[in-house]
Amino acid sequence: MSESATPHGSPGEKLRLAGLIGVLGVVYGDIGTSPLYAVQASLSYFPGNKLQESDVLGLLSLIFWALIITVTIKYVLLIMRADNEGEGGTLSLMALAQRVTQSDRTKWIIGIIGICGAGLFFGDATITPAISVLSAVEGMEVVSPGLKEFVLPIAIAVILVLFFVQRFGTARVGGAFGPIMVIWFVVIGALGLHQIFIHPNVLRALVPVYGAAFIMRHDLLAFIALGSVVLAVTGAEALYADMGHFGAKPIRVSWLFFVLPCLLLNYFGQGALVIRDPHAASNPFFFLLPHALVVPMVILATIATVIASQAVISGAYSVARQSTQLGLLPRMPIRYTNETEQGQIYVPPVNSFLFVVVVLLVLGFGSSSALASAYGIAVTGTFLSTNALAAFVYCRHFNWPLRRTVLVFGAIGLVDFAFFSSNVLKVFDGGWVPLAIGFSLITVMTTWRRGRALLHQRWQQDSLPLASFLGRLPQSRIVRVPGVAVFMTGNPEYTPSSLLHNLKHNKVLHETVVFVTVRNPGVPFVGDARRAKVEELSEGVYRVLLSFGFMESPNIPRALDLLREQGLPFNPMQISYFLGRETIVAATVPKLGFIRRAIFLFMLRNAISATEFFKIPSDRVVELGVRIAI
């Protein structure tokens, strides 16, 4: 593993202007639109007539050091080193951490941490489009308070269009995302710089003493305000999650030399404005503008928030696909919106889920300031899970001494925990929403994983070891018929139930029998050279292990074509695929509780078939039912 990850399929990480602009359009949409609401939410705890200059400087100092510690040091300098063959993200980090340990118990703990991070990500993915679009459209109220009644309808319309166009793909529109975000960052940076020239004393907030003094002076109120300060770093996870698309170096360079300076200029500009005019604290971002430019800025901000929302939605699709490949979610339909870019996907169930929840959040909360109370807790929970996984990888994979690991990641973890605990105070003020969504997803993932493990366990108990079956085969009087039969099996050491049922009912066996097991080795991509492992068990009987990465979509016929190129004596066009379809019944002593079993059965019934998921031609498939009690 290299310090700078190389994106899959890329010859290297050469810095090109087009690549840097592309990074801006995908990676920084979320964190780049945080100035719309972060300062406003942080100042909301202080009435305008009681707002002191020292309070503004203290909050700015906390925002500055949050960006330095959480984003720059933690993600840009440390966690982006821990790539999984070029890929980033919580589940990718989880898979890497599980690869570097042999302990089943440790793997289980790592899996739970990864599941928690992924579940909380979905909680965050519902809040981001809602608060981003609302905060942008609310700029109309600065033009005229009478326009307030149009904010919700316009926000709903923008969200409706955003989710509707997902099915058509974002490749064409995505080409414009980068240049638009360049304009966005330049504009917000220039607006802030203008105010800093007017009141340069605001730069004193760069000194951490002001942040520390603010905390000591206001104690509990300062602790509560941390829950809004963290809004400035929401979207930091995207820097790590999108490594596979762009590589580490372009993301680091664009952050350090463009995005971070522009964000800091805007934050400090808002602070300078509020120091001069405390009443601007009601919406400091839009009060940076001359009145005549507010409407154009509302339009630009709305476009920027749509880009931010698009990045989160695409991230949710990617996490859903990874979860499916890693066995954490049932098989779901995945549509490719670009024939040449397998990263551009559309997952209908995820899109529908996000759309419904986002609309309900907009209608339920009604304003970005109300949503700010719900925002943050899921993000900070993800920060904690990522920090724990990264600490394990640094200790085991990079061989850091335990003392150094604890010192570095312990210090960062304290910052993450401070942000998380301050957001816990907002649980009853809306923070329960992303928590409920996150823990619902965690329950779904753990239930699916547990249910599949029980199915595998019961199937194994009722199955015949493959060695025993092959030992009896030469003495049997089973009629061999022409053709090739492929039997899918979850365990290569046991005889597939579909084969036993076929023998029981049809009394024949094909001349060529291939047992196929699909595995995920915990890496994002597997090249064709490593795709298949073939073993001839006896005359005409083969065992094939196929490996697919968690960023790939398995295609069994295409993988078997590779075997023909290696000299395996069968024609894929003559293959019949035999699959088992489970019928679940309640066991005498159930191992899944009533509610979890109901959830598992619902997911099992609604999962797409193995035929569709593995891209197997439906006219070549024979399905045989199997009853399993759990």
Curated annotation (Swiss-Prot):
It is a multi-pass membrane protein. The chain crosses the membrane at residues 19-39, 59-79, 108-128, 145-165, 173-193, 220-240, 255-275, 284-304, 345-365, 374-394, 405-425, 427-447. GO terms for molecular function: potassium ion transmembrane transporter activity; symporter activity. Keywords: Cell inner membrane, Cell membrane, Ion transport, Membrane, Potassium, Potassium transport, Symport, Transmembrane, Transmembrane helix, Transport. InterPro entries: K+_transporter (IPR003855), K_trans_C (IPR053952), K_trans_N (IPR053951), Kup (IPR023051). One of its GO terms (cellular component) is plasma membrane. Pfam families: K_trans (PF02705), K_trans_C (PF22776). Coiled coil: none annotated. It is found in: Cell inner membrane. The keyword Ribonucleoprotein does not apply. It comes from the Bacteria. It catalyses: K(+)(in) + H(+)(in) = K(+)(out) + H(+)(out). Transport of potassium into the cell. Likely operates as a K(+):H(+) symporter. Belongs to the HAK/KUP transporter (TC 2.A.72) family. This is Probable potassium transport system protein Kup. It comes from Acidiphilium cryptum (strain JF-5). The lineage of its organism: Bacteria, Pseudomonadati, Pseudomonadota, Alphaproteobacteria, Acetobacterales.
